[in-house]
């Protein structure tokens, strides 16, 4: 261990010698502290007693005060950093630019091109003996210099293009890496921790913590440094990240005071003195070791990667992003993380599959091209021209074969979409950067894209939907219900004394109210917001809680039962001077009231509190408060007389019972003003919002109505946690998916829920197979116990302000403002990523199809590709790197929220896109072939076809090349719209990158054509020829308008491409129109069809039911992820026939909106999200049958017709 110590001390960049010399002013050395922190439990206690006496002794040696902390003097901080190190673990060195260049060179297609170019170069300098070139066929026998010059220029130009492609790729990777390092440091800066300095409690960045700091530790913290406990309340730590021990470890001064960095506080609170930071902390030591061993592992991994890369060939290039949560994360990650991994991101899966398919097709085409060229040449030379094979002709023939090989490789280069991973990376990187401005700090790249597919959001209430600024607005004190805060004199003196002491000591001492930052502003609430509301209540009663706290400091508290999600209450025991004990308790009113056997009456004396009285208070006080959306808290106490033996404090159930109720208060937490609008947007976008909260059901329902999660007259479900558990579990208490499936489609509010309930709900929705598309669930969480739900969800959002470190660790995105509207922005960005990729694909596949067909046909007919290797590489650069940059950086618009989610199995290339790809490819091929075979006549120039081996560039082929590039440039503008919109220029000037790239490419094209000469096989063109090229290019814009006029539904032969998962055969009728796809050209057509659709709806329903039964036989055998179909007709609950289960009414019987059917009939036409799942129980089957037959549920084709209008 000693070696290890030296190792990491050296690592921290401060020389050992300096440290040891300097320790003189502190009574303890770095090495001593490190060896102390390696001990646990009793060993550590013995060592502390032996060397330092007690923890106070360590504080003395570290020159710090347990109550006042460090002075915060800059000189002192600097000295401590010099001796004990900074709280910073050096990150792994980033890859250098040269390493990234080397990685880019590993691309298989580029390696083939490099070899071909080198062979071409070598042969161009080879002069065959004798002058019999004329016997060898059609070689251009001009001046020897010119011939050799032309020969080497092509090889050199290919090499140069390869260098360009490699440099651009490496630069992109480098800037991406730089950006994510910036993101990482931003995440680190966001992390703050509470310490005491100069007697003041302040929050400082984790990196600024130094040895000797007194840090406050509370529930949910991720400890940033090693330390020793000075004072603790019921502290339990999860040390599994360091020790692998799954049980929570109790920490106390007399058992085990050692707190280690990287561990999570699962319960309780306390204070510790920091004894080791950075590379000297337990986490730091492990990181240092990993850093040393990491390089060797990296080399091993690279070897493996090379093997797989060689095997996968071009297809390997298509892995868009090795994401944090990708299935193919390396083994090391698996070992290090004991949390469940999420499955591969949807887009990644689809892209990988599509790219492999394109790669295979490209490989096939290039192979056929080379074979045809070689055969044609051999047959023409040997049989047609009857030339003998002469030894001196061999090099020249080899040059021909190399030329054919280069053509084949360039066909492959153009066909293989290397730009695909680049487009994904750029789009995600661009989005992540911009999302930061929208208060979304993305931790895992995939999450950004997955959010675009989200179909359900399970949101917390407090702080996300509400403002998290809590105030007491009503109170029930001395048997009187005050609708506003009572005057202090209205409350009997002894009740006031109980209130003041009970609230002051039974709220965490970290919760406090500070004066406003600006004059006239609101006071600042620090710590738990509910506790701040209670402290604020005391201030409203003209009492100061701080006086009580000064009198009873935290160390004097005898025992604290801290708040957790199981208890839903907090209790504190005080020891009085006469030896008696008093316990104060506060918590959810219905929970604490059940433990109350007495209540303080109007004269302030305790009187008997019977169950009947409790029911009266619930009906007359608590329910009215809750129905106004108030959170109700009950305050109570109990005395333990002095004469009796001291209670067994660990036996909580016997202690916190037989209480006397002091008061019940109603706390208001107003709904954020922007939330109702954001929820409407979600519902319009086909996303169901559910509220999961710990509050009681009436409070939750009232808030849900205010937010718009529930609307009056709807028959959606509101359940409490225990009711939810009763319905989803069988007699043995096991959760059954079938039971969850009967509840979740209608569930909108889950109240009084524990984190386990939240996890169960999320898992149930994700695992459900009742819809064709698997649900994509986003979850918000702030508590330590929300970790499992955040991990299980497709996208986990943690609260940046109220969230615990544990929740942030488990999340994918951190909401820096804790606001629900930021989630809606994340949806918008996610859908934008999807659209950006689709735009790029639409553009690229058009170029691919045209370039491959032109090269292939040209090669077969004229033994030469009309587009030369270097030109192809330039086109490749345009369409891969530059187009991916241009199209992947389009900003999102509100229109993205008018569509339903794409769904996991929706193909990347929709039928509208397929129509655009084939339509534009047709136009471009007609233009190119017309120019290729009739260009010389049209422009009255020499033909470039059948030119000899080293002929100078021809005007003819230059016009073909130039027109081809112009068509791509204008088609890039067309590619901006993928849903059949007419106006392709809409918002074009909002995207400066797009305009810059299009103009830049145009300028470079002019330079290449006019001055490129032999290297680019270009000849200068006249103004007239240029105008023709541009005119034919602009033709793609007009042609695009013509294509968008043709309704997609008429083109039955079109299929989609790029399915992420295995795809079933779908009957042709069902393919008539995509559910989520809005082709704007069809809107006019649709209006007339709606009545017709309505008339046919019942028949369609019956057909769907039959289809459902037919397909479910097969679908039941498949995994949920692999089932895929474009429609999710058959699984809508309207079409499900319930079995003879015992019927449980699915409306909570306390629901105020029980007369839903009558109200519903009188309401205006349903909103997109209304009655999302109309029939969920046999009880409603008869009453709702007619409605379900004529209503359209979101996701059904009819519904998409109605809403699109």
From Swiss-Prot:
Gene Ontology biological-process entries: regulation of cytosolic calcium ion concentration
Keyword Protease attached: no
One Pfam entry name: Hydrolase
SMART domains xrefs: Cation_ATPase_N (SM00831)
Chief location of this protein within or outside the cell: membrane
Coiled-coil residue windows: none
Induction of expression: By vitamin D and 1,25-dihydroxyvitamin D3, and by calcium and phosphorous deficiency.
Polar residues composition-biased segments: 1183-1205
Region listing for Disordered, in residue ranges: 296-343, 1145-1205
Enzyme class: translocase
Binding-site residues, Mg(2+): 460, 462, 782
Topology class, membrane: Multi-pass membrane protein
Compositional bias ranges of the Basic and acidic residues kind: 300-310, 322-343
EC nos: 7.2.2.10
Ranges per topology, Cytoplasmic: 2-104, 175-351, 425-840, 890-912, 977-990, 1046-1205
Similarity section: Belongs to the cation transport ATPase (P-type) (TC 3.A.3) family. Type IIB subfamily.
Name the UniProt record assigns to this protein: Plasma membrane calcium-transporting ATPase 1
